[in-house]
Amino acid sequence: MGLFDTLLGNASETSAEAVNEELMPILAANESVTAAFKLVRDLSVFTTKRLILIDKQGLTGRKVNYHSIPYKSITQFVVETAGHFDTDAELKIWLSGKADAIEIELSASSAQEVQRNLATQLFA
């Protein structure tokens, strides 16, 4: 991830192996990380069972919010790719029982990979 993307807050892919090791204490016994995308300090993590949105809060990032979304609760998703003057992409996911979408900013280069990961987990 380049400095410009970091400053803009655009997510880019990060090492699934490193994230798997970091999240080992909260993963189920038969669960592993398949892909992860970093947004400054926050992470969007795709596992074999769920999507985990990790929000590191505060100045030090010691307070962490883990939003766990089972794939079966995702009813639809939209990936909006970047345009000529728009440098970022966006993922919107809707959950059963919720009217509003959850929005996640992405880098233009990771939009297709995020869409592929979601499609693989939802439709495979």
Language-model features, listed with the residues they occupy:
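Low-complexity intrinsically disordered segments
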Residues: K92-A124
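Hydrophobic transmembrane alpha-helix bundles
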Residues: E22, A35, Y71-V79, E103-E105, ...
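Charged, low-complexity, helix/coiled-coil-prone segments
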Residues: N10-L23, I52-H67, T120-L122
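Anionic N-terminal interaction surfaces
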Residues: M1-S44, D100, S107-S109, A124
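Phosphoinositide-binding peripheral membrane targeting modules
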Residues: L27-L43, T47-A99
